[in-house]
Amino acid sequence: TAADLAAYLAKHSYPLIVVGLPKTIDNDVYPIKQSLGAWTAAEEGAKFFMNVVKENSANPRALTIHEVMGRNCGWLTYKTAQCYRKMLKSMSSRGLFLDDFNLTMGRQDVHAVYVPESKIDFEDEALRLRAVMDKWDSVNIFVSEGAGVKDIIDEMRRRGEDVPVDAFGHPRLDKVNVGQYIGKRFGEMLGAEKVQVFKSGYFARAAAPNKKDLKLIEKCARKAVECALAGESGVVGPDENKAGEIRACEFPRIKGGKPFNVRKGSFRKMLTEIGQPNPRKKRTSR
């Protein structure tokens, strides 16, 4: 938005300094290394799932889907799952699980993480997750709202269904409903007796910033004021091409839709821990 405004003003010879701040919890803006609020959204999404997953303690063969915001980028889904598993490990170390009440780490753990940057192999994953269901009587999946969208849209069109789009021409994800689709498909393949889909989107993005985000916000806000007073336009944030320096990134370099790097070490480590094969790279951030 700031880049569009700056371009419009320049076109009409209007001398005005424009300084923007990157505020998207998807964390998908080039060349911003970390956008404001994304850490908080991941932490709050983890808290959200920590509460709703307790439903599976009272249901046999429970399939629980956590749909996380992220149209084109899986960073938030990855980070939310990572935060959630960190909470689980902390609970385990303090002896807070109650096996006799179906409150076990295995039952509450993340069993699959699906992001837009990699393809979902339903057949292979169903075989793997069926074994998880048989062992724990529960399967929990974290999925980005944009994961597998193309395949779902293709199937909708084959059935003759209309695919509504928003003002920008993007498919309306609330109508495509990735979480419901995955829940229905895996529910049948895993023999689930109860399927529940939860969306943490508004809960996570409406939260007050955590301490880590507050520090980043303060640094960026101070730099933004400095840039404005110095007559320097741009979007202020940690520039991933300048060793993370907080600076006014030039407007021509600003672009949304930066994909999550599925070869990121911590992501691959998490998938290994939960028994999910590492995805083949479709695309990575540059």
Placement of each model-derived feature along the sequence:
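Short, ordered loop/turn segments at secondary-structure junctions
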Residues: 21-27, 118-119, 145-148, 200-203, ...
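Gly-rich Lys/Arg/Thr-decorated short loops/hinges at beta-loop-alpha junctions or inter-strand turns
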Residues: 23-33, 60-61
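A broad, low-specificity signal for short, low-complexity segments enriched in glycine/proline
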Residues: 26-28, 99-105, 196-198, 224
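C-terminal non-catalytic interaction/assembly regions of soluble proteins
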Residues: 152-286
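Accessory alpha-helical/coil subdomains and C-terminal extensions
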Residues: 1-15, 19, 35-193
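Short beta-strand elements at the ligand-binding edges of bilobed clamshell
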Residues: 31-41, 208-214
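Generic secondary-structure boundary/loop-capping signal
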Residues: 26, 33-35, 66, 110-112, ...
